């Protein structure tokens, strides 16, 4: 994660001084490695944090979206920006599973994928837990299934491909979801042709795992659990089975394993044979039947992985790829974004964090969506993050460079964009590097970002508040990091009074993007 600071006297003709000159990237590898060792880390622990106050001071409740066993879900509107979000409010009690709720927060903070619900911020008070996330106005996939009954293969493949991408990403991150079902798949928006964009939600029962781990806790929802969960000896393959159940329901209009009660359902799952004789099933394409067979493979060790499922022939057709690419990449826009990547720089981490917060709060902005679409296009293996070879391919494709030129650019860009130093470029890292942040500098957006740092709400930012923000990442908790932050703070505190005023903060943001 991270956002760049401009050079004052170079690249004036770009009209966006947030980017540094290409000379930055001709420094030798030793200097780059040294820069990484001496840099602060900007990751989601910094950007997504406990706001230490009742969210109703920042957001207004619009309407109640639902009520569950332990709390409520509300539609919110940001008082400054007017943007809409969802908020889950959980009452702390002996009956609410606080451990699972904290687990969900911690896992969501690590995830950055277009098909996974994004957490924006949270607050843990004495009596309640508040979680603020994206708002998906179209509701649950479950409700769509009730209305529609049966989906066409085009409609179903579009949904299943997205879910598999989310599952593959989670598994790569060492996370098992353990409760994939239509109620935990939200519809974010619809295409004009009716195709649904979806996001996976509810990570309360998810769990970190290592390859080969076997888990014994009985977790999940009756229709969607695989045989090995019933036997209490399962791994990440359980998620793939659940995706298979969702796929069967979409295509056939009923669960593959049914019964009068849970015992009947578990018995049917334990046998593992689903109905293939119905007229609806018989009309499915051979590719659809084959993928269902692989997803619902009884033996978990023989079950297809989410990664391999994404390459299945059901998705690997020209018709599907045309269907899935609902966005069109404008050649000129792509050229500008790829060019912006080259000038990306992050030498004042406080400025980076301010702009990172603005982007995180504005991911539904059209420019962010364009950049996200480019990210998806560059992500050739669909694992939700960019590797260096994918960036090299992108430069060869979009900038007409040979492999040596593309490698040189990718090497330099990669080091500057990967400011959490995990060896990959995540979606938001990429987006922040290739868009013009000028789109986020309305007075209300600036005040929202200012308030992100102004923890006590006194109208000024202290160095201790900045340190507190960055120390939320354990990787920054050291004296060297504190000294670096103080030096960067002094660069922004123009009048030297020991605080950053809103005027100084606004000048910082506007100054680094002015031509």
Which stretches of residues belong to each language-model region?
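Conserved N-lobe ATP-binding subsite of Hanks-type protein kinase domains
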Residues: 72
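Conserved N-lobe beta3->alphaC-helix segment of eukaryotic protein kinase catalytic domains
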Residues: 89-111
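A short, aromatic-enriched beta-strand patch in the conserved N-lobe beta-sheet
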Residues: 121-122
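Conserved short submotifs of the Hanks-type protein kinase catalytic core
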Residues: 127-140, 144
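Activation segment signature within eukaryotic-like protein kinase domains
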Residues: 159-160
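Amphipathic regulatory helices of Ca2+-sensor modules
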Residues: 355-356, 387-401, 426-437, 462-475, ...
């Amino acid at each position: 994660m991270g956002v760049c600071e401009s050079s004052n006297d170079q690249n004036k003709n770009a009209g966006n001084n947030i980017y540094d000159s290409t000379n930055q990237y001709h420094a030798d590898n030793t200097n780059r490695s040294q820069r990484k060792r001496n840099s602060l880390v900007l990751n989601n622990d910094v950007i997504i944090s406990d706001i230490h106050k009742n969210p109703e001071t920042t957001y207004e409740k619009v309407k109640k979206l639902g009520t569950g066993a332990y709390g409520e879900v509300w539609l919110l509107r940001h008082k400054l920006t007017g943007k809409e979000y969802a908020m889950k409010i959980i009452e702390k009690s002996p009956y609410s599973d606080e451990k699972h709720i904290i687990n969900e927060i911690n896992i969501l903070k690590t995830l950055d994928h277009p098909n996974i619900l994004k957490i924006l911020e949270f607050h843990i008070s004495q009596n309640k837990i508040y979680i603020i996330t994206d708002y998906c106005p179209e509701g649950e996939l479950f409700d769509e299934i009730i209305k529609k009954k049966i989906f066409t293969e085009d409609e179903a493949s579009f949904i299943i491909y997205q879910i598999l991408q989310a599952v593959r990403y989670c598994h790569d991150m060492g996370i098992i979801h353990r409760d994939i079902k239509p109620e935990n798949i939200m519809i974010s928006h619809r295409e004009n042709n009716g195709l649904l964009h979806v996001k996976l939600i509810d990570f309360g029962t998810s769990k970190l795992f290592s390859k080969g781990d076997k888990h014994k806790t009985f977790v999940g929802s009756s229709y969607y659990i695989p045989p090995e969960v019933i036997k209490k000896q399962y791994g990440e393959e359980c998620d793939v089975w659940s995706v298979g159940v969702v796929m069967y329901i979409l295509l056939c209009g009923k669960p593959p394993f049914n019964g009068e009660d849970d015992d009947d359902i578990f018995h049917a799952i334990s046998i593992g044979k689903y109905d293939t004789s119905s007229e609806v099933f018989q009309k499915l394409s051979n590719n659809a039947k084959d993928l269902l067979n692989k997803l619902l493979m009884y033996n978990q060790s023989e079950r297809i992985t989410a990664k391999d499922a994404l390459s299945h022939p059901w998705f690997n057709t020209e018709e599907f790829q045309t269907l899935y690419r609902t966005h069109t990449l404008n050649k000129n826009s792509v050229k500008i974004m790829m060019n912006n990547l080259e000038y990306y720089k992050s030498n004042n981490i406080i400025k980076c964090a301010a702009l990172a917060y603005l982007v995180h709060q504005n991911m539904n902005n059209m420019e962010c969506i364009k950049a996200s679409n480019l990210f998806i296009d560059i992500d050739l293996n669909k694992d939700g993050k960019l590797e260096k070879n994918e960036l090299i391919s992108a430069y060869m494709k979009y900038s007409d460079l040979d492999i040596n030129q593309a490698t040189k650019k990718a090497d330099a860009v990669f080091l500057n964009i990967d400011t959490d130093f995990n060896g990959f470029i995540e979606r938001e890292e990429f987006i922040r590097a290739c868009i013009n942040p000028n789109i986020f500098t309305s007075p209300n957006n600036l005040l929202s970002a200012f308030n992100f740092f102004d923890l006590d709400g006194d109208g000024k930012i202290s160095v201790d508040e900045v340190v507190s923000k960055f120390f939320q990442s354990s990787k920054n908790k050291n004296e060297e990091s504190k000294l670096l932050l103080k030096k960067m703070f002094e660069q922004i505190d123009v009048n030297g009074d020991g605080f950053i005023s809103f005027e100084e903060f606004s000048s910082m943001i506007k100054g680094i993007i002015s031509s």
